[in-house]
């Protein structure tokens, strides 16, 4: 594979904590970001992006309302709605067409760390520092809390499988466990054990067959989601902040403290390592804390602790 730096998105005034891309071809150039500056930004393409590396895209809207760090964002399938999680103990559902907050979700008693949309866009799951996993409808009403077999420490990450027939929730926590839940019943399906430090991120493959998880030790683990079995583990060489699968290739991307690592999942090898070209007198290299792939797999967005989103073009062959 070949990866080339294409430019950056600047507009946040704090760490870029999360990134999400719409999953429809007509919105392939759009991305939504969250930040420690308490806002979300919705980005569109810059017609002049090829003439200036500093303006790959332009913010369409700045979504304001949270009173603390915004930690995560998830998009509806059509890309028209975003749900955000915040350290102000709340979630918010946003209409990206007009920039308005439609609903505020209250129920968590501590910082909310992660959020995800169900495949049919009718339910939302969230996890946070109150150790709770909550399932909501899109109007902000908490339908139930997944309590039996729950995490015994912070819930750091939650994701849905893409299956419409039998959707499951995957969660990771500071108790070193990855848990798989049946959405229909709210029951724990299985514990995926193996991490020796807290779980920082979970992700589910586009076909729903695989789950990957990462931890603070810099280890990514691959699981058979249907069987609940461990398949392999890969070392990134640095603590991993977030992981995501390529939408159309057998690759996995990891945002780490030392840059981006892309793994070939068949060979379990790191095939690409990316580091930002840091300019300035300070020798502090920014840390990659968030990552997202466009729906067509041709663009990789990465968020950093210097408040910048860096954009990479991805092709299969060098």
From Swiss-Prot:
Alphabetized UniProt keyword annotations: Repeat, Ribonucleoprotein, Ribosomal protein, WD repeat
Disulfide topology: none
Keyword Transport: no
Molecular function, one GO term: ribosome binding
Record-level GO cellular component terms: cytoplasm; ribonucleoprotein complex; ribosome
Family: Belongs to the WD repeat G protein beta family. Ribosomal protein RACK1 subfamily.
Protein name per UniProt: Small ribosomal subunit protein RACK1
Organism expressing this protein natively: Trypanosoma brucei brucei
């Amino acid at each position: 594979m070949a990866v080339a730096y294409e430019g950056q998105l600047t507009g946040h005034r704090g760490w870029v904590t999360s990134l999400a891309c719409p999953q429809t071809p007509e919105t392939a150039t759009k991305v939504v970001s969250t930040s420690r500056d308490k806002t979300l930004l919705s980005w569109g393409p810059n017609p002049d992006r090829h003439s200036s590396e500093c303006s790959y895209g332009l913010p369409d809207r700045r979504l304001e309302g949270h009173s603390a760090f915004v930690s995560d964002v998830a998009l509806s399938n059509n890309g028209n709605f975003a749900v955000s999680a915040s350290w102000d103990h709340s979630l918010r559902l946003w209409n990206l067409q007009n920039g308005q907050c439609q609903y505020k979700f209250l129920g968590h008693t501590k910082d909310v760390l992660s959020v995800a949309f169900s495949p049919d866009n009718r339910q939302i799951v969230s996890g946070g520092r109150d150790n709770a996993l909550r399932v909501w409808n899109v109007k902000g009403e908490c339908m139930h809390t997944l309590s039996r077999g729950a995490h015994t420490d912070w819930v750091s990450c939650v994701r849905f499988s893409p299956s419409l027939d039998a959707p499951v929730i995957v969660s990771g926590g500071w108790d070193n466990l990855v848990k798989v839940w049946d959405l229909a019943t709210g029951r724990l399906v299985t514990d995926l054990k193996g991490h020796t430090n807290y779980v920082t991120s979970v992700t589910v493959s586009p076909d729903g067959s695989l789950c990957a998880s990462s931890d603070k030790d810099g280890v990514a683990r691959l699981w058979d989601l249907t069987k609940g079995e461990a398949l392999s583990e890969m070392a990134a060489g640095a603590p991993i902040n977030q992981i995501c699968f390529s939408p159309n290739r057998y690759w996995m991307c990891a945002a780490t403290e030392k840059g981006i690592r892309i793994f070939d999942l068949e060979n379990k090898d790191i095939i690409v390592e990316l580091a930002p070209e840091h300019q300035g007198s300070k020798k502090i290299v920014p840390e990659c804390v968030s990552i997202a792939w466009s729906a067509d797999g041709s663009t990789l967005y990465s968020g950093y602790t210097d408040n910048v989103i860096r954009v990479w073009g991805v092709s299969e062959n060098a």
